[in-house]
Regions:
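Bacterial N-terminal signal peptides that target proteins for export
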Residues: 1-7
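N-terminal signal peptide c-region/cleavage motif recognized by signal peptidases
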Residues: 15-16, 20
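Metallo-beta-lactamase
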Residues: 21-28, 34, 119-186
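Conserved beta-strand hairpin/beta-sheet module of binuclear metal-dependent hydrolase folds
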Residues: 24-81, 172-193
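Pre-active-site segment of Zn-dependent metallo-hydrolases
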Residues: 46-93, 104-107, 161-165, 198-207
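Active-site neighborhood of phospho(di)ester-bond hydrolases with catalytic His/Asp-centered motifs
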Residues: 50-51, 88-98, 117-120, 189-195, ...
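Active-site HxH/HxHxD metal-binding segment of metal-dependent hydrolases
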Residues: 59-62, 79-144, 155-160
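Cap/insert and terminal regions of metallo-dependent hydrolase folds
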Residues: 74, 196-257
Length: 257
């Protein structure tokens, strides 16, 4: 049984009748996986596009210094036309601006006036320089309301403490956020983002008590630290299952870069 099968088995063992997977309807709270970390979250009557990487298969060189640097990204094609990924969306959630979450194709074809939520002003300034005009930075201190939905930024770490002690690697890893979605009468959704399991993840779980947790679990690794991931992996799925037996786990960001 391979890693993907193991993770999917762990995730599917947990169910929540109030949330659907791969059901693309604004009338149903649901998550539609597209590719990599890209997906559509239908929530409380609104649709969010998450971390759009919209290039065709093999457009980009592999990430230098990673175990899969010899492979060109993305590894697979989109399951739909790129334009269909953002059809009828209300906003974009951009957890960070690494190429596998925000690529040049997305920057080119997305409507410049679309609402985009980013992790901080620095990413907001970058998007403004790319021509986007409707940007809101989320904050750890203060929630943001969007069309009756409460968005909270959550913390994390795109690698271990030891990795961030290496200045060059710390600059590459940089920052990434998670986001929680809350609305009256709807399940709480926690989009974890690109992070390893940290005290900030525990803090978010304890504070928001998610009914649904979308986890980036590809266990990506660098050549400098081959024994540690820069995002979550199988052990983190098992940990989440044990910690949150009644939470639906959705595992993504595994096999496309």
């Amino acid at each position: 049984m391979n890693l993907k099968t193991l993770i999917n088995t762990a995730a599917l063992a947990i169910s929540a009748n109030t949330f659907a997977v791969d059901l693309a309807s604004k009338n149903t709270d649901s998550y539609q996986h597209i590719r990599n970390a890209t997906g559509r979250l239908n929530y409380a009557g609104k649709t969010f596009l998450i971390d759009p990487m919209l290039a065709e298969k093999g457009r980009y060189a592999g990430f230098e210094g990673t175990l899969n640097s010899h492979l060109r990204n993305p590894l697979v094609e989109l399951p739909m036309k790129a334009e269909d990924t953002f059809k009828d969306i209300d906003a974009i959630i951009l957890t960070h601006t690494h190429e596998d979450h925000w690529d040049e194709v997305a920057q080119k074809i997305l409507p410049k006036s679309i609402k985009i939520f980013v992790q901080h002003e620095r990413d907001g300034d970058l998007l403004k320089a790319q021509g986007f005009t409707n940007i809101t930075s989320l904050s750890l201190e203060k929630p943001v309301e969007f069309e009756g939905i409460i968005l909270n930024k959550t913390g994390g770490s795109h690698g271990t403490t030891e990795m961030y002690a290496v200045p060059q690697l710390a600059e590459i890893l940089d920052e990434a956020m998670g986001v929680t979605f809350q609305a009256k009468g709807h399940p709480t959704v926690y989009l974890v983002g690109d992070t390893v399991w940290t005290a900030e993840v525990n803090k978010a779980i304890n504070r928001y008590k998610p009914d649904v947790m979308i986890m980036n679990t590809g266990d990506a690794r660098t050549l400098a630290f081959p024994n540690d991931g820069i995002i979550m992996g199988l052990q983190d799925v098992a940990h989440a299952r044990n910690m949150l037996p009644n939470t639906k786990l959705i595992t993504v960001h595994m096999d496309a870069v």
